Amino acid sequence: MKIDTILTVAALLAVCSPSRPAWARESWPEPTEAAKQRVAEFRQHEQDVLKHIQPELEAWAKKGKPFIPWAAKPGDLPQAKVPAFPGAEGGGEFSFGGRGGRIYVVTNLADSGPGTFREACEAAGPRIVVFNVAGIIQLQKPVFIDAPYLTIAGQTAPGDGVCVAGESTLVNAHDVVIRYMRFRRATTNVFDRDDALGGNPVGNIIVDHCSASWGLDENLSMYRHMYSPPGGGKDLKLPTVNITIQWSISSESLNPYNHAFGSTIGGLNSTFHHNLWACNTARNPSVGMYGDFTLVNNVLFNWHHRTVDGGDENSYFNIINNYFKPGPDTPTNDPIRYRILKPEARRAKPPVDDFGKAYVTGNVVEGNEKVTADNWAGGVQIEPLGDPVPLLRGIRTDQPFAHALLTAQSAVEAYQSVLAGAGATLPKRDAVDTRIIDEVRTGKVTYEAGRGIITDISQVGGYPEYQGAPAKDIGADGIPLAWKKKYKLDVNDPDLAGRDLQGDGCTVIEKYLAGLDPTKNIDWSNPRNNVNTLTADTFKPAR
């Protein structure tokens, strides 16, 4: 079917209008002097963190674990020989994380001090963070992850698990693995409009089974980092490289200032699969960088004026087998209702209608049989200065662009898998995610007055309680004594957690975190072994 016969008049009129309606314009008030002072304090705190960790960064560089802040291509960062964890896929699959490093056990919910989340994240050197406390970690200022080689294992928390609240967690390094964590910011101070989880990530990043909500810019954003060259000069905006966000949820970005945005993501060798974007007006998600962008098996629900958009003339989109479900806030008589992708073009200099390329197939738009049957029958929309018909022909490609290894499902299968398994499902799914999943499944939102778009968390019940008693048999290495005894390990070995007993590339604590038998050798060269062994609600891949 020819593109010029399937693009509707309504779509042409919509995409050719450059002005934004009032509801799409942000309305940030001017910050007060007190607010500006608060921002200055946050910036000073990060400078203090950088100064504190610098000697250790230099020491670890001599040990073969350097910080590489100038990375701008996938090959600039070394890759591990085995997956970051069983079930890791995509561009970030071979992140080192904190493998072989010091183990931090989070034992209290304070903002700072010994045994806190901040202490572990703002340290330097390879490190693995486990939890022996449940509850809300109420941050007073952002947490800055400024040193590479970090693994955060939220699945280790007792009871209902933990939730990071009040401020942002900012990833400004490489080789960072974050699993089964909740980041629910909820701050509405205009001076501090930031993401729940974001930052300036360099690369080798994988975010898995995390839940991000109630951000004031976006909920979960990772796509670029700023690099300051030695000797001064202008800071360089570089792409994040080797990144995966998988099995995660970005929901209910706050909208007091017309800015309830889900995510800006991207980078080089970037993969985003089995995620859910729900009840965000826009950026569901937005593509924040040039180059390859692979979006597979995601679910989008209840957007208002933007679904997937962004990129530039050097973008190569794989938009494959995603499920788009309009909600109460999605306009009924507007092309946005069935929009799958809106690629952006060069605007600053000629040629002004220079778009990238897109492989768009297998996506389902619930309620629109035409676009579901043929995603190019109005699902790809542009805002050109010239004739859109030949431009759409030039954007379209019938073969996918090269991307990292990934196990894919149909859009309908992915819809069920995402609702069953996305977000911080361990140690258990919390009331927020349970409610969001129910809203997606039924199409009925909790906050009816805002059609699912909220300005304050009180409109949806606020924070739930997270309860759980600390385990009594967890030592400094973060591994329960009972688990060591179960596998007849040497309980008196102070270095046991960091040992690779089977020579398969995984340490004892990594096998504990992944629910694996530490006495068995795993052949990681067989992709069939790279399966999440922690949760049964994710599908079993057939590789």
Task: Identify the residue ranges that each predicted region occupies.
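Structural detector of coil-to-beta-strand junctions
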Residues: 168, 196, 219, 260-264, ...
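Extracellular beta-rich repeat passengers
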Residues: 27-59, 66-73, 289, 294-457
